[in-house]
Amino acid sequence: MAWLRLAFGNLRVNRRRTAITLLSVAVGVGGLVFLWAFIDGINAQMINNMTGYVTGDLKVHQRGFHDDREMNIALAERWNLTEEVSAVAGVAATTPRVTGHALASREDQSRALQVMGVDSATEPRVTRLDRSIVRGRYLERGNEILVGVDAAGALDVSPGDELVLVVQASDGSIGADRFEVVGVFETGIKRIDGFVAQMPLAAAQSLYAFQGRFTEIAARVQDADRLDEVVGTVGNQLRDRNVEVLGWPALMPSLVQMVAFHDAVAYIVIFVVFVVVAAGIVNTILMSVLERGREFGVMMALGTPSSRIVWLVLLETTVLAGLGYLLGLVLGLSVTGYFSSNGLDFSAYIKAMDTMPGLSGIVYPTIEAQRLVVIGIVVVSVALLAAALPAWNAGRNSPLEAMGARRTMINRIRRIHWQVTSDHRLLIFAQMALRSVFRNPRRSMITASATAFGLAAYLFLYAFADGFFEQMIQNSTQQLSGHVQVMAKGHDVDLSPDLRIAD
């Protein structure tokens, strides 16, 4: 406790320098907390929306269906797989489905849709599309269909209107039927609002000639962190049934890669911030050691072991980093808490966000406790590593060398001399500046290195982002769209054959 009081007292000797260092650490930590929460919020939203609106946490298919998507690779109702999966520990809910594609049309409007035939009683326990209805109601029975707000706009339909769906049935024939639009949903995700539709399971089985069968069983797990364990348990339970059990990472590998990419960008930025924070801490500790050379010399002359001097310097560093971390935590949690409640509105960039599956126009940062622990451990560790050299220098000198260290440095600087006349005031100021720099060359080198690293990191991140977006533009224009397209008005939205340019 006495050493801790001494460490706090030493930090109060130069309060301005300590305050500046604390502020730099706090701003760095606060920025890291918010950045990590922001990226975690993006990733969590993509995962929650895609699993919550479409896939569920896991699916059971007949083996081969996921790769080939052929309708004749189906599960039979008589196998009672839904009941078996529901009985597995860790599974919260299950629902059978028939999924396929259809061409929906009304008068002169048409659009391709991904159709999901669902059990209206069990589907809401696995997904939440029923809670996103903005007009009309959810499915009940008969030839009813639920469409997204973008699809409804493209097809010009509202609840009460009819759509004609044309499909290729499981037996290879062409199936068609009329369906009443009973509801319109809005998730804020273009690829769902524009291209996903639901109908009652029996209606889908009739449309696709799928009586007594379904393409998949979707399930919701009780604990998302135990998904792999539950997938393995379900797979073992059904190992004799020639089925495959896939969790959402296997169902949506592009989403997994997108999450990994976001994490990689976060780690790069975090590394840059940590280096800058370390430079600020080592600067403070180095100056403290230099200015207190006489104090350390007296302590060693009175019998204090050099190891205790090193311990004192490292303790001061730990206190400095710890206080900076706590202040940064308060700052970061305050900012993150505000935006977690109110969200960050990126609706102006909704077109760009369409490239990230499941991401809507408003992002809500999420805080994970383990991230805060990691930041705290790394901040203190980086600070101790940065202070190791100054601490070792403070403890390795003899009492006489320690007491004369500062005077020796000052005398060495005074020997640096330039013959400058009074008419060259600019050179006089340059001489004074150089003397200040060379007064502590090690500190100056650390500061210059930190500045150079920060600039290099900024240029790298800027070039990385610039190259990333430039590559996206080039790949899209060279391989697909070209630089300019001429089309009938509205064709880019509806993709209707009727919206064509006359010969």
Name each model-derived stretch.
Residues 98-100, 111-118, 132-203:
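Hydrophobic secondary-structure segments that place a key small or acidic residue at a functional site
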Residues 362-413:
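C-terminal membrane-exit region of the final transmembrane helix in multipass inner-membrane proteins
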Residues 169-266:
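Mechanotransmission and gating elements of multispan inner-membrane complexes involved in transport
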Residues 327-374:
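Short helix-loop junctions at transmembrane helix boundaries
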Residues 15-42, 260-295, 318-327, 378-385, ...:
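Hydrophobic alpha-helical transmembrane segments of multi-pass inner-membrane transport and secretion
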Residues 1-33, 43, 307, 399, ...:
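N-terminal Sec/SRP start-transfer signal
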Residues 286, 297-340:
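Transmembrane alpha-helical interface segments in multi-pass membrane proteins
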Residues 30-114, 135-141, 456-503:
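Hydrophobic, regular-secondary-structure patches
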